[in-house]
Curated annotation (Swiss-Prot):
This is Aspartate 1-decarboxylase. The keyword Translocase does not apply. SUPFAM superfamilies: ADC-like (SSF50692). Its EC number is 4.1.1.11. It comes from Clostridium kluyveri (strain ATCC 8527 / DSM 555 / NBRC 12016 / NCIMB 10680 / K1). Keywords: Autocatalytic cleavage, Cytoplasm, Decarboxylase, Lyase, Pantothenate biosynthesis, Pyruvate, Schiff base, Zymogen. It is an enzyme of class 4 (lyase). Substrate binds at residues 57, 73-75. GO terms for cellular component: cytosol. It catalyses: L-aspartate + H(+) = beta-alanine + CO2. Catalyzes the pyruvoyl-dependent decarboxylation of aspartate to produce beta-alanine. Heterooctamer of four alpha and four beta subunits.
Amino acid sequence: MQLNMLKSKIHRATVTEANLNYVGSITIDRELMESAHIIEYEKIQVVDIDNGNRLETYVIAGEKGSKVICLNGAAARHVQPGDKVILMTYCQMDEEEAKIHKPIVIFLDENNSIFQITDYEKHGQVK
C-alpha cells in the first residue's frame, strides 16, 4: 500500500502577484523551490490563509532571488496579492518508508525570505 505523505511545505508565503491572463500554474522563486526540494512542474497544493481557498496546480520556476509567489490563470481568481498562503507538495511511499519520513518545512517572513528550515512539525511546535 502506498501512502500520500507531506514532502515539502512553504509556510506563510506572501502572494506577490495574481496573473489571470497567464496559461496556468504558480510561479515560485527558484531559490525557495530549491530550499523546499520542489521541482518545476511538480503538483502543488495552495492554501490561502486569508480566505480559506484551497487549490491544486503545478509549479513553474521564477527568477532566483525574486521572492515571487504568483498565481497564474484560473488560480489567480482565488488569491489576492498580499494574501498569506501555505504551499505543500506530497510524495508516495510505502508504510515502512513513511514511518521514518520527515518532510522539509520552510518558514518565510513577510518579504518571502527564509527565516527557518526544519524537518519537524508537530501541532504547536517547531524545532
